Amino acid sequence: MDYNVKDFGALGDGVSDDTAAIQAAIDAAYAAGGGTVYLPAGEYRVSGGEEPSDGCLTIKSNVHIVGAGMGETVIKLVDGWDQDVTGIVRSAYGEETSNFGMSDLTLDGNRDNTSGKVDGWFNGYIPGEDGADRDVTLERVEIREMSGYGFDPHEQTINLTIRDSVAHDNGLDGFVADFQIGGVFENNVSYNNDRHGFNIVTSTNDFVLSNNVAYGNGGAGLVVQRGSSDVAHPYDILIDGGAYYDNGLEGVQIKMAHDVTLQNAEIYGNGLYGVRVYGAEDVQILDNYIHDNSQNGSYAEILLQSYDDTAGVSGNFYTTTGTWIEGNTIVGSANSTYGIQERDDGTDYSSLYANSVSNVQNGSVRLYGANSVVSDLPGTGQQATLEGTAGNDTLGGSDAHETLLGLDGNDRLNGGAGNDILDGGAGRDNLTGGAGADLFRVSARTDSYRTDSASFNDLITDFDASQDRIDLSALGFTGLGDGYNGTLLLQVSADGSRTYLKSLEADAEGRRFEIALDGNFAGLLGAGNLLFERTAIEGDAGDNALLGTSAAETLLGHAGNDTLDGGAGDDILVGGAGRDSLTGGAGADVFRFDALSDSQRNYDIGDNQGDRIADFAVGEDKLDVSALGFTGLGDGYNGTLALVLNSAGDRTYVKSYENGADGYRFEFSLDGNYLELLGNEDFIFATPSGQQLLEGSAGNDSLQGTAADEVIHGGGGRDTLAGGAGADVFRFSELTDSYRDSASYADLITDFDASEDRIDLSGLGFSGLGNGYGGTLALQVNSAGTRTYLKSFETNAAGERFEIALDGDLSALGGANLILDARTVLAGGDGNDTLSGSSAAEELLGGVGNDSLDGGAGNDILDGGAGRDTLSGGSGSDIFRFGGALDSFRNYASGTNGTDSITDFTPGEDLIDLSVLGYTGLGDGYNGTLAIVLNDAGTKTYLKNRESDAEGNQFEIALEGNHADQLDASDFIFATAAATTGIEVVGGSGTQTDQLA
């Protein structure tokens, strides 16, 4: 319903005070549940209330004030007003107001004929209190001649829109967005204001500024900033399009804010910087035209600097980090120093890609950050890296441009929207780019391959040939062909549902590179979407000095004592023969050795041809020795490499102690002390040969193993699996490999041997045995005792729940039979084995025999098995697991001692896993408990079951050192009381005697 203010006595004659009449129309509309208050063309004079917060006119919920057009309908403050007015039109102070606004009129503050601070439009709730104004719309409104702010939506407001409006000749800012949530400024103009054109301030978030213009303002054209109070910084701000020019300070300033994007704007003719990023994080500056700024002195067109607020309200120092600047055209004025400049104040991690910079005085770019990079090539705008683990990970991206790194394990990567980079790493990975132009990167041939009997290839589920790309440049293939001589064969399945890129040439382990794409891409893949080569910079047989650029390149020194510097970019450096000096420069670089003679030393004759790496970056760079056959770090023997620090502590050597026939052995050095920093993850090693794989299909398969140790993976369908002799692993990589819903699709394992076989569930996220809920699996045996089930009672969205069937009564099945994470397994045989772990998390299985197990660094699991074993966890949080009562026992009657010894147990960090044996706690050694006993010398602590089995054997473990007063239940993984119901404690007589009575 419309309420014409003239019906309430307003005159609009430019003389009379119409405040009361207009307010009466507003109140009437509000009382009726809402409506439109209409002001015909004319000049309506208004005056303020007793307090500044009274304003002149108070707008209310569901009321919209509408005029006849900007300049036609004018609401103007009366001459001579000398008090502050916080809003000529405003919402009520301390009330939550919703669904209101104003359109098609002008507010005039009459600045020349009044005194006091006067604002034009004001709304918002009480600062710091719960509550907010909501759903506010202003369209085609002009605000002029205010001594204070023009548009000032102030404090908590949700869903504000101001569009097609103008603010000019105001004493402070033209447009303010103060603590606005989910709002929009669109197609507005702000000019000739004494301070800023647009000021986005005080915790504003999820806010869009689209196609706005600010010019001729005394301050900046647009500012995004925290403001003067110590509050949460503005974030998730998008500035898209528009123009910011001829302002006194910056064109755009982003200060104490994060996750701000400035794109597609023209910024020019401003007094200081075109754009200034000031104590902000994760700012993107994309595809703008920034030119002819620095009109008032010598400044950069774009400046990145940190902000020192240590003497301010927060007491903090805000470092500018994570700025991404790409695709901008930057042209300097006669005063412009740099196109893009970092200050030397901690500003770092800036990424500059494909910007065109010209006509600047000192240089295109000046960077100080150690981790900042610049490239002439386009980037993909990555603002975050999502990194997996050595296990089977699921990584999901957002709408941003991200890099997803699966690392080891069978990973599932989904980029979401945005231009993403997906690198599955080792393992059989499932890669989905999502929306956007995505890059699928393969970093090693062994990341995706097949053998004669099984497939370990990655699958790309949604490749878009029109915009996605596959980066194979690190693999050495030359292009498409017949699959031989370094080419890849493009092959489509018979039903046209899948396309393969494959090499038909196998490595020494029988592995052939192969990657699969869902869909038929015959005729669609080529130079536009397959990246085979990076630029090669090659030397010759002499002593060469090779220098890379900002692009990703391969530097090949060949023979001679060469000096290689990759510059910026993710480079590959291959020194070749001779004593070479290698510097990767910025970027994630790979230092590759293709032959043992590339870097070698002969200690007998004193000939040192070892290469030297000047700037290895742990966690970013890689050392590629995969072609040489080394399989890990160790003692320098048996295919391992040792780390050795020189006496000065300033150089680390990576060396093999095994000489060739000519007396030379492989060795290179790194400048600096990396002794405690380098791990297997910093190397690309050769993959050791291991168990054979039997791989099923999506159908109902019957897989029969042999006497060898095998990994058996049925895949989809209802499969029958038999391992045969040997220590076999039955692998389930998807919930739907074995499940039931209204019917059973569970796989059946016909010959599971609990003494040596295992079930690999590492890709499914289960934590262990339990009641079938909360990520656990229930262990159930049918009433006839002929079949055992491992089952989850939790269903997926399709109503499917995981279940496996095993022939026989396997009620003694325990954690030792399940692989719940994807750690590397080091397994011994039937003899007396010595197993040594690395810095990674590993599982060491001694098997039969008197074994010596050393976990090394990492959080390891040590299981000595049968025999009298010596167990050393090394550093990390280790688990010493016992899967049978005779794994560690003593027979006092016969004098037989099969007690395992743990050399370095750390209470509070390490754990002893006895959950399979039925023990429920510490005690007197009876009734399912273990007694703690210290020897007379105080040098060894025993854990003892005092109840013998039928042969007189008693379970017992020895721990080096005095732990008698340190051990408690938290150092053990015991069986729960529920789990032991109806189960006899392993190794006990079955007769319970109350020793405490």
Swiss-Prot record:
Composed of one catalytically active A module and four R modules. Its EC number is 5.1.3.37. SMART domains: CASH, PbH1. One of its GO terms (cellular component) is extracellular space. The keyword Isomerase applies. Its cofactor is Ca(2+). GO terms for biological process: alginic acid biosynthetic process. It catalyses: [(1->4)-beta-D-mannuronosyl](n) = [alginate](n). This is Mannuronan C5-epimerase AlgE2. It is found in: Secreted. Pfam families: Beta_helix, HemolysinCabind, Pect-lyase_RHGA_epim, Peptidase_M10_C. Inhibited by zinc. Converts beta-D-mannuronic acid (M) to alpha-L-guluronic acid (G), producing a polymer with gel-forming capacity, required for the formation of the cyst coat. Its main location: secreted. Each enzyme of this family of C5 epimerases introduces its own characteristic sequence distribution of G-blocks in their substrates, explaining the extensive sequence variability of alginates. These alginates of varying composition have different physical properties and are necessary at different stages of the bacterium life cycle. Belongs to the D-mannuronate C5-epimerase family. Hemolysin-type calcium-binding repeats lie at residues 388-403, 406-422, 424-439, 557-573, 574-591, 696-711, 713-730, 828-839, 846-862, 864-880. Pathway: Glycan biosynthesis; alginate biosynthesis. It comes from the Bacteria. Keywords: Alginate biosynthesis, Calcium, Isomerase, Repeat, Secreted. PbH1 repeats lie at residues 133-155, 157-179, 180-202, 204-226, 257-279, 280-315, 320-359. The gene is algE2. One of its GO terms (molecular function) is calcium ion binding.
